[in-house]
Structures are given as structure tokens and as C-alpha cells.
Amino acid sequence: MSAELPIIPKNELTLDGLKGKKIAIIGYGNQGKAHAQNLRDSGFTVTVGARHPEEAKNDGFETTVICEAADADLVILALPDELQGEIYSEQIEPNLPSGATLGFIHGLAIHYGIISPPRGIGAILVAPKGPGITVRQRYTEGKGVPALLAVAQENKTDTARQIALAWATGIGSARVGV
């Protein structure tokens, strides 16, 4: 069985949903690094929460411990799947502000209930269809990597979709297809 995946019209793909928002990326590996750099180059301030923050610091990011980074409007989990559940429950969930949105780069943790955000916390997916190094390279070339976008749960202010659209735009995916 197949499902039709619509391409989002370009006029819906703007950076507006993230303007004035505090953005944190948890993890600075393959995808986290690319998302952080592309969002920064799109004009946003990004804080990196990482177990090993040295590389992010060297790349010019403000870094902090994960539990402090979780105090953001958009908290992007760029961690290996096997670590997401424990880090979320111990360090992120207790520190999420009311109405925040969790961002996922792949949907395993949400789909299988490893992470179940409370009501009022958004859960969105922006999943580029390529490795982080390609997401970054295409962005710097003025191109992009197509991405899948989904809203699994709305946030308190019903802005999860606008945040996801802005995130996809900020990493360059809107240039080629979301």
C-alpha cells in the first residue's frame, strides 16, 4: 500500500515560524551539526546541548549541558535512537517550557512510543533524505536536500506546523522539496 506525499507549496515555506524562537539542538553528530550550522547561517541563534561539546564550541556555537539546553521553544533531538528515550526522560522533559516543540530528525522514538510528550508539547519531524554532510554541503552550494515533514502532536499555541516549515526552510530543504 502506498500513500501520496504532497509537496508543500513554496509560499508556505518561510522562516517565519522560528522568528524570535529559542532553538536548541541536542547532539552534534552527523545530522545535528548540519542542522545547527544551516539554521545559524539562515539567521537563527542556536544553542547546542551535547555530551561532548568541544566540536560545537570550536564551530562557534554556544554550548551547554543538555538539561539547560532543553529550556527552548524548539528542542531538536539529534541523538542516536538508542539514547533518545533515556536522555529525554531524565534531562529534557523535566526542563521543557510549557508549549515547547520537540523536533525529530527521524521518527522512531515517537512512532514506537519511546518518547511520549505531554499534551501541549509539540512533536514534529523534519527528516532530510540524505546524510548530514550532504545536507550541509548542498546548503552551502545554495541547494538543498529534500525532506519529509510531519506533525505528530500540536503544541499549546497551535504553531507546530509553522515551526516545522521554518525548520525545513532553515536547513535548505525548501529549495528542493518538502
Where are these regions (language model features)?
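Glycine-rich adenosine-cofactor-binding loop
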Residues: 21-35
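Rossmann-fold NAD(P) dinucleotide-binding segment
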Residues: 67-112
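NAD(P)-binding Rossmann-fold cofactor-contacting core
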Residues: 34, 40-59
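Glycine/serine-rich phosphate-binding loop and adjoining beta1-alpha1 elements at the start
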Residues: 1-22, 50, 151, 172-178
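Residues at the starts of beta-strands that form the adenosine-phosphate
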Residues: 22, 45-47, 122
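Conserved SAM-binding strand-loop segment of SAM-dependent methyltransferases
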Residues: 60-65
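Rossmann-fold dinucleotide-binding core
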Residues: 103-178
